[in-house]
């Protein structure tokens, strides 16, 4: 039972959110109101989770939107009687924390913990129904010991390996990036630096072992946004095709392999294109060609962020087409990627847009091998023909539909040994090595005798050294820490060195959702029974920018750990909501390209640059310090209260759409809550006194109350929070118009129902008005109301009246009227008499509730 020591003063009509919210947050904490219920056999569970934040030090409005959405869903499910797990933690490792700590000359650990403390206090201001007893940070030793444990589990399963590889190197952050962390312009997703290529020995996870399952199981994710599934589908990039082996004429034992999905065009190949680093290049002896290739390498390096020109360098190498033994020149081309397929592609200019452009530019032959219609005569092509059709100039395959020829040519190649059916993926193994201090150490020892040796699980954790040297704008790498790096080999016992790379931070976030159900377990990363009971996450909320990073890695981890028999689930997240960005007005001078702070603008209704008086363009863009359009959540809460901030965030736009910040809209929600406050203050003064009741008013209120219950329940269930608040407003209008003219039982029932419906959206004021109308326990311990279908039935309906099938009138008919009464009422109406008077009525057909047809 919750009975606060201090009740809010009810002798004022002024709504004071700061006092109300502070009071109730304290009560919730004291009473441990949001502690997760233990699951029983009869429990109906709901696991609600927001993507956990990186502790940057301050909440921004994007955070607020994410956590308020999840909190609303968690509260709603709790009202519906479910055992709810709604935890929070911190994604605490990574370069931003290390760089920020270096700037301040302090340890990343100190910096991170300070930020966590501040952000936690900010989150609590929002009134989130979080079970804080389950909180952890990924930089805690008692968390990353289990990240290391799971690394070793994956190692034992053959999913971890080390190899020398050309990697993406960030020259600003001095670390390796996974392919997914390099944007379309070739820049680091963190620092924005142009990414370089570097050869290093690195640790990888075999995510490609699960490529097919990751792709196929997207079909199971019915409650994921389609665009996220498409992004993952494209990233995995399954291609079903054929590897074709071309002999090299100067060396019959040497072959070049090309992957293609179009073996039907093999007779149209007029050149092969290879990448700048293809192994065949070492067979080129002409110095001029070698220099041209070096120049091309430099061009590609310098223009990673620009649209590349399709440059080609003809070599002296000649391949032999296996289908007709024709010689084919080999070119080095700027558009061929080392990392995709075999680093070589066949050029079919007649039937590929890119190849056509390349051939025209470099005077390469164009050979037409597919026509649209069998009767069509061949002619010189003005553009590539890329549709289906029939083969020509293809020996014994002439006249065959190209879709059939694909299979036949491929089959002939397989039978004759120059082709192999192949499934290929764009997805590459996950590179997890990072060359920085602030990350989870890799539990491997490097021994001169035994090589790379995994530690025994009993030797975990490999803790980060605390005696770090912060100087020269960097934290010395783990390899420079003599006291830390030196150890003994767990296999042979001789002197050895610890692995000095740390893990990609996505290693920590790929399993954190598995830790919450048993976050205090000290003997293993999680209890199998708890995972099988609580997982998958029923509702996951976070940004779409994580579609091909965190979300893909988390799915991989789940499947890999399932195969290690650590639990039985296949997918981690049942339902995914990707919220839109929070945007705010930014003022841009298009002449200078600079953004101007609103505080420097005299008149925001007609904004001009205070320096050159140029008219400023007003743009709604993602909140950012550089654009001077950030809104501090704490200042909004201080001025209007957390409930107002929550209501605005939930009302302004559907959750998956971008939200435009508007002060007037925030004030509108504050006024709405103030009106609710005044109504309940007024009602509380005579809550038990009998007032005169009016049946029509009672009927109206009962109906609006049941409509609200039905619509708000459906809207929250479908993540339509903005329309749910619209229904709340309609119910409030009916409540305020009718509450003083209904019987006392209905009055209390309606006030009680409105309070419960409001509670997931505005949890603090709901607690206070719940007390005002005489209830002692927390409103958040109540059950969600059910609507009464009978109350939604209309007293009357509109009857359409036809004469000989043509509409002549409409009339409101009481539901209780029978057919004789309906006939008597309608046949007297002037609009009907006009068409029936002095005529014989042969038949009257009535479809009750809809239509009446008079046949004359």
UniProtKB/Swiss-Prot annotation:
PANTHER family: LEUCINE--TRNA LIGASE, MITOCHONDRIAL, LEUCYL-TRNA SYNTHETASE. Pfam families: Anticodon_1 (PF08264), tRNA-synt_1 (PF00133), tRNA-synt_1_2 (PF13603), tRNA-synt_1g (PF09334). ATP binds at residue 625. One of its GO terms (cellular component) is cytosol. Signal peptide: none annotated. InterPro entries: aa-tRNA-synth_I_CS (IPR001412), aa-tRNA-synth_Ia (IPR002300), Leu-tRNA-ligase (IPR002302), Leu_tRNA-synth_edit (IPR025709), M/V/L/I-tRNA-synth_anticd-bd (IPR013155), Methionyl/Leucyl_tRNA_Synth (IPR015413), Rossmann-like_a/b/a_fold (IPR014729), tRNAsynth_Ia_anticodon-bd (IPR009080). A motif ('KMSKS' region) lies at residues 622-626. It catalyses: tRNA(Leu) + L-leucine + ATP = L-leucyl-tRNA(Leu) + AMP + diphosphate. The lineage of its organism: Bacteria, Bacillati, Cyanobacteriota, Cyanophyceae, Synechococcales. One of its GO terms (biological process) is leucyl-tRNA aminoacylation. Its EC number is 6.1.1.4. This is Leucine--tRNA ligase. Belongs to the class-I aminoacyl-tRNA synthetase family. GO terms for molecular function: aminoacyl-tRNA deacylase activity; ATP binding; leucine-tRNA ligase activity. Keywords: Aminoacyl-tRNA synthetase, ATP-binding, Cytoplasm, Ligase, Nucleotide-binding, Protein biosynthesis. Its main location: cytoplasm. It is found in: Cytoplasm. A motif ('HIGH' region) lies at residues 53-63. Gene3D superfamilies: HUPs, Isoleucyl-tRNA Synthetase, Domain 1.
């Amino acid at each position: 039972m919750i009975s606060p020591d201090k009740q809010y003063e009810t002798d004022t009509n002024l709504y004071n959110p700061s006092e109300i919210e502070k009071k109730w947050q304290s009560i919730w904490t004291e009473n441990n109101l949001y502690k997760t219920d233990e699951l029983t056999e009869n429990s109906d569970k709901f696991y609600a989770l927001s993507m956990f934040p990186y502790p940057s030090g301050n909440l921004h409005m994007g955070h607020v939107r994410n956590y308020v959405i999840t909190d609303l869903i968690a509260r709603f499910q709790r009202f519906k009687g479910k055992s709810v797990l709604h935890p929070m933690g911190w994604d605490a490792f990574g370069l931003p924390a290390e760089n920020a700590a270096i700037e301040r000359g302090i340890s990343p650990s100190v910096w991170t913990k300070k930020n966590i403390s501040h952000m936690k206090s900010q989150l609590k201001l929002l009134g989130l129904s979080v079970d804080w007893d389950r909180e952890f940070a990924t930089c805690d030793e008692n968390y990353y010991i289990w990240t290391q444990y799971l690394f070793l589990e994956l190692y034992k399963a053959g999913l971890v390996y080390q190899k020398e590889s050309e990697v993406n190197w960030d020259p600003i952050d001095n670390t390796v990036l996974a392919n997914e962390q390099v944007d379309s312009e070739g820049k680091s997703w963190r620092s924005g630096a142009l990414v370089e290529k570097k050869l290093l020995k690195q640790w990888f996870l075999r995510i490609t072992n699960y490529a097919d399952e990751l792709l196929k199981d997207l079909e199971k994710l019915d409650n994921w946004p389609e665009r996220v599934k498409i992004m993952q589908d494209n990233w995995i990039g399954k291609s079903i095709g054929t590897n074709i082996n071309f002999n090299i004429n100067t060396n019959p034992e040497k072959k070049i392999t090309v992957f293609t999905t179009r073996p039907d065009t093999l007779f149209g190949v007029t050149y092969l294109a290879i990448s700048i680093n293809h192994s065949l290049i070492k067979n080129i002896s002409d110095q001029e060609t070698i220099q041209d290739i070096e120049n091309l390498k430099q061009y590609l390096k310098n223009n990673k962020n620009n649209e590349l020109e399709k440059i080609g360098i003809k070599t002296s190498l000649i391949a032999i087409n296996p289908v007709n033994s024709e010689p084919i020149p080999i070119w080095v081309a700027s558009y061929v990627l080392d990392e995709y397929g075999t680093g070589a592609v066949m050029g079919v200019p007649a039937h590929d847009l890119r190849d056509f452009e390349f051939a025209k530019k470099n005077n390469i032959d164009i050979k037409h091998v597919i026509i649209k219609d069998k009767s069509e005569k061949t002619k010189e092509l003005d553009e590539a023909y890329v549709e289906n059709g029939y083969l020509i100039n293809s020996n014994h395959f002439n006249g065959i539909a190209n879709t059939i020829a694909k299979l036949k040519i491929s089959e002939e190649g397989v039978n004759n040994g120059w082709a192999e059916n192949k499934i290929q993926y764009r997805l590459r193994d996950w590179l997890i090595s990072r060359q920085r201090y602030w990350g989870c150490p890799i539990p491997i020892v490097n021994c001169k005798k035994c090589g790379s040796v995994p530690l025994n699980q009993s030797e975990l954790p490999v803790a980060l050294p605390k005696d770090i040297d912060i100087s020269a704008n960097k934290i010395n790498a783990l390899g420079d820490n003599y006291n830390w790096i030196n150890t003994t080999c767990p296999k042979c016992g001789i002197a050895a060195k610890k692995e000095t790379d740390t893990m990609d931070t996505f290693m920590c976030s790929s399993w954190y959702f598995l830790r919450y159900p048993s976050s205090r377990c000290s003997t293993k990363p999680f209890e199998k029974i708890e995972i099988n009971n609580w997982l998958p996450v029923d509702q996951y909320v976070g940004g779409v920018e994580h579609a091909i990073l965190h979300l893909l890695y988390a799915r991989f981890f789940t499947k890999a750990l399932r195969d290690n028999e650590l639990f039985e689930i296949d997918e981690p997240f049942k339902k995914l909501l990707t919220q839109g960005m929070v945007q705010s007005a930014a003022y841009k001078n298009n002449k200078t390209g600079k953004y101007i702070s609103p505080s420097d603008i005299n008149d925001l209704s007609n904004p001009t640059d205070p320096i050159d008086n140029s008219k400023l363009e007003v743009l709604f863009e993602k909140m950012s310090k550089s654009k001077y359009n950030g809104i501090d959540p704490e200042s909004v809460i201080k001025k209007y209260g957390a409930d107002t901030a929550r209501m605005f965030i939930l009302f302004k736009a559907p959750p998956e759409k971008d939200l435009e910040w508007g002060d007037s809209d925030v004030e509108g929600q504050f006024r709405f809550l103030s009106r609710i406050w005044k109504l309940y203050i007024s009602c509380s003064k005579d809550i038990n006194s009998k007032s005169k009741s009016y049946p029509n008013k009672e009927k109206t209120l009962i109906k609006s109350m049941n409509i609200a219950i039905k619509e708000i329940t459906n809207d929250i269930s479908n993540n339509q929070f903005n329309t749910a608040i619209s229904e709340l407003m309609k119910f409030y209008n009916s409540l305020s118009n009718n509450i003083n003219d209904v019987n006392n039982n209905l009055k209390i029932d309606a006030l009680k129902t409105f309070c419960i419906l409001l509670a997931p959206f505005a949890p603090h004021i709901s607690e206070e008005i719940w007390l005002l109308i005489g209830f002692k326990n927390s409103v958040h311990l109540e059950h969600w109301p059910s609507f009464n279908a009978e109350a939604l039935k209309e007293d009357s309906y509109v009857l359409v009246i036809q004469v000989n099938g043509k509409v002549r009138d409409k009339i409101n008919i009481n539901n209780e009227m029978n057919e004789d009464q309906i006939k008597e009422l309608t046949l007297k109406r002037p609009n009907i008499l006009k068409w029936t008077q002095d005529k014989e009525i042969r038949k009257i057909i009535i479809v009750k509730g809809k239509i009446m047809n008079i046949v004359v």
